[in-house]
């Protein structure tokens, strides 16, 4: 897989936000929509790097349409990539669903994914899919700062403390020990944060900021969703993770006040076919299925993410992409390439 080609796709995608891609073996031609296939008695195993309820709804609908027997294991992005790597010579799964684009790009570059040109690729904006079919974006994720509204109003507001809405706010002494974030070594969300800060601020100022932030953080979690859950429960005041995860917590009654901070990092959650000959026809059919509007509606409903299929309506209350204060030149390729180096530096002290 050619990293420069993926970088070109990333920049093209960001042009659309304001108003990656790879080489390798030729992809197989795409098949029909999943709903038109009879796959009864055939099996599909997935590694899923997003919410279990989302995966279950997708799996149930795919099974209803095709008769295929679907099972999945939920793993954070970093753990999923490590597992797929370890199983390279004897793969145990057919599909990797979710995670981050930089991780899928790394998997493709390492020969862990198989390119597949889905017939339904045209349903996904070209800016959010690999041009050779190694992965397809399903929905967009954006980083945000969230805080527990109840705790803030009771414990911090009476003291005259301003609500945290910017990256610099996280460095205030009042918030030391009250911040929870995902671990960039295991979580794609965490890697998106570290990498976007470094790319936006530059190496010198970026590391200066991150080294000041680290002692402020009380806990780093393997999962990108957990920080929002724990902040929502009041165990910590502040979370930094994807706004869709924060919205899911708030929707369950644990109110988080969320702000997409200026120059926020972002990613797409892809689907890719793991190199595994065992269940090829079912795996390809699932990719065809998950790119459809019907699957996209499930993704938006259960994740609050912004679908990469333009026929799918955005989440209620979400601003259009062009109005979000994103870090528009964020390089997904660099995020994947620099992950190990950045994590080693961040946790060196």
Predicted regions and their residues:
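Early extracytoplasmic/lumenal segment of secretory-pathway proteins
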Residues: 22, 32-106
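Short, low-complexity disordered leader/linker segments with a strong preference
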Residues: 1-43
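A bilobed periplasmic-binding-protein/Venus flytrap-type ligand-binding module shared by bacterial periplasmic
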Residues: 146-151, 268-280, 298-299
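An extracytoplasmic/periplasmic, membrane-proximal ligand-sensing/linker region
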Residues: 203-205, 305-349
């Amino acid at each position: 897989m050619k990293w420069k080609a993926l970088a070109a796709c990333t920049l093209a995608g960001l042009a659309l936000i304001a108003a990656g891609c790879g080489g390798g073996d030729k992809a197989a031609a795409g098949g029909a929509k999943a709903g038109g296939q009879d796959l009864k008695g055939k099996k599909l195993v997935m590694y899923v790097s997003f919410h279990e309820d989302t995966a279950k709804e997708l799996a149930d609908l795919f099974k209803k349409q095709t008769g295929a027997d679907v099972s999945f294991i939920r793993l954070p992005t970093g753990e999923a990539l490590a597992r797929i790597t370890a199983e390279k010579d004897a793969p145990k799964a057919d599909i990797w669903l979710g995670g981050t684009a930089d991780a899928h790009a790394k998997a493709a570059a390492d020969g862990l994914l198989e390119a597949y040109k889905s017939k339904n690729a045209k349903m996904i904006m070209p800016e959010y899919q690999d041009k050779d079919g190694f992965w397809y974006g399903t929905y967009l994720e954006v980083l945000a700062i969230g805080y527990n509204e109840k705790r803030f109003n009771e414990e911090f507001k009476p003291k005259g403390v301003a609500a945290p809405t910017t990256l610099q706010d996280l460095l205030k002494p009042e918030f030391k020990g009250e911040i929870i974030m995902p671990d960039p070594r295991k979580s794609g969300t965490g890697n998106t944060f570290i990498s976007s800060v470094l790319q936006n601020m530059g190496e010198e100022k970026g590391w200066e900021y991150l080294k000041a932030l680290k002692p402020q953080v009380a806990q780093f979690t393997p999962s990108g969703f957990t920080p929002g859950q724990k902040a929502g429960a009041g165990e910590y005041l502040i979370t930094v993770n994807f706004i869709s995860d924060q919205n899911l917590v708030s929707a369950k009654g644990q109110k988080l006040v969320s702000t997409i901070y200026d120059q926020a990092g972002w990613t797409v959650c892809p689907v890719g076919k793991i190199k595994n000959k065992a269940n090829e026809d079912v795996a390809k059919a699932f990719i065809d299925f998950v790119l459809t509007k019907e699957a996209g509606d499930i993704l938006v409903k259960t994740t609050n993410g912004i679908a990469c299929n333009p026929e799918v309506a955005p989440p209620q209350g979400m601003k259009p992409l062009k109005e979000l204060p994103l870090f528009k030149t964020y390089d997904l390729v660099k995020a994947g390439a620099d992950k190990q180096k950045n994590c080693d530096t961040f946790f060196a002290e």
